[in-house]
Amino acid sequence: DNKNIKLLLIGIGKYKNDMEKKVKELNLEKNIVFLGTRNDVDELYQAMDCFILPSLYEGLPLVGVEAQINNLYCLFSNTITKELKISEKSYYLNINNLNEWKNKISEIQLLDRQKLYEINVKKFDITEISKKIQERYINYGKK
C-alpha cells in the first residue's frame, strides 16, 4: 500500500525472469529493484529498514546473520533453522501466509515511525535545548 517502499532483490535465482515479468505486469518497476549479484551488500544493509528472507529451502544462511549484525529487523520464513535467530528484532513467519508477512512489515514501519518520533521529541525537548544553550554560554564565557 505504501508507495515509498522499495524492495531490493539481491542475488539471482531460477525465477528471476518470471519475477521481472510480473513486476512489469503490475507496474511496480519504481518499487521493486533487481540488483543481481553484488559485492557491496554491507553498504546496501545501511540503506535498509528491514531484511526479508522468504526462503523455501535454507540451512543456516550467512546473509541472515549479516542482516542481524547490521541491526536490521529480519523476517525469515519458518522453513529456516531457528538457530539463525540472534536478535530480538528477528521473526519467523509462515512461508504460506502472505497476510502474516504484510502485517509484520506494517508493524515494523509503525515501530520505526514511533522510534523516530521519540528521537525527535527528545531532540526538541525544551529541557534538552535549555541545557545545550546553557553549555554554549558557559563555553563562550570561558573564551
Segments the model singles out, each with a brief description of its role:
Residues 1-33, 142:
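A conserved nucleotide-sugar
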Residues 32, 51-52:
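A short hydrophobic beta-strand element within the catalytic core of glycosyltransferases
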Residues 37, 56:
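Aromatic "clamp/platform" in nucleotide-sugar-dependent glycosyltransferases that forms part
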Residues 48:
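An anion/phosphate-binding loop that grips the pyrophosphate of nucleotide cofactors and donors
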Residues 61-65:
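Short glycine/serine-rich donor-binding loops of glycosyltransferases
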Residues 69, 73-77:
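Short hydrophobic beta-strand element within catalytic cores of glycosyltransferases
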Residues 112-143:
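A charged, aromatic-enriched C-terminal amphipathic alpha-helix characteristic of glycosyltransferases
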